[in-house]
Amino acid sequence: MSIVKEAHNVKVLGSGEKTIVLGHGFGTDQSVWKHLVPYLIDEYRVVLYDNMGAGPTNPDYFDFHRYSSLEGYAYDLLSILEELEIKCCIYLGHSSSAMTGVVASIFRPDLFSKLILVSASPRFLNTDDYYGGFELEEIDQLCQAMESNYKAWIAGFAPLVVGGDMDSVAVQEFSRTLFNMRPDIALSVFRTVFTFDLRHFLSQVTVPCHIIQSSLDVAVPVAVSQYLHQNLGGMSIVEIISTEGADCFGSYRRGSEMETKRGSDDAVTIALR
């Protein structure tokens, strides 16, 4: 196995003609897609990977300087595509990985036929003329809480982001993947994600984008999805859904339902058409 495949725990499933690459968000790993993958493998070649710093990755490979910006993650994504000799793919990214796909598509637009951006935000911090959802003081307080007591921070952060109590499957899953991250790496990634400003990249995007946004997402206001739609350089559409919490956790909450039903109104299904 190559270094790239080993470092990112790359898995390739299915044998369809089209390739879809799934990128997970902060605090999770590729297991977040476990309820979605069974519905893709009959029609697509599905590529799963872990972002560097995620629990299943080797923390010794985490370069704090490289991953202090999303460009480092974008170059990792491009390396994976190159290693697998993927000439063109659909990229489905959640949260920070959605923006990783945006940046990677600017570097190599030929490798992407479509970007599906779930709970994407080019900037989480508010400015005088932009509403991202957070003030810098709030992010600083969250970082201080992480440094002070990482376990206690997870107990408060996971239910808030996912939307549910600690007994819910979705919250327990998110808590598990957060616990699997080394605390200092989790803090570094968190600070990078919640303080980046990628708005200047948007006009350079030429790949078609399908934006999926939950109306109840506590981390990304609906206004951000409209901002993306208005400022992306290429064609884009926005789909607002009513799933509570961060949208990638919908598969955990609806696990049994998704295993028995693939509704025509499923957001990802629609985006793949």
Swiss-Prot record:
Top-level taxon of origin: Eukaryota
Record's GO cellular component terms: cytoplasm; nucleus
Compartment annotation: Nucleus; Cytoplasm
Tissue specificity remark: Expressed in stigma.
This protein's UniProt keywords: Cytoplasm, Hydrolase, Nucleus
Top-level enzyme category: hydrolase
Catalytic residues, chain numbering: 95 (nucleophile), 217
InterPro entries reported in the protein's UniProt record: AB_hydrolase_1, AB_hydrolase_fold
Membrane-spanning intervals of the chain: none
EC number(s) given by UniProt: 3.1.-.-
Gene Ontology MF annotations: hydrolase activity
Transport among keywords: no
PANTHER family: ESTERASE-RELATED
UniProt similarity note: Belongs to the AB hydrolase superfamily.
Known function: May be involved in plant olfaction during volatile communication.
Protein name, per record: Karrikin insensitive 2 receptor B
Species the sequence originates in: Petunia hybrida
Taxonomic lineage: Eukaryota, Viridiplantae, Streptophyta, Embryophyta, Tracheophyta
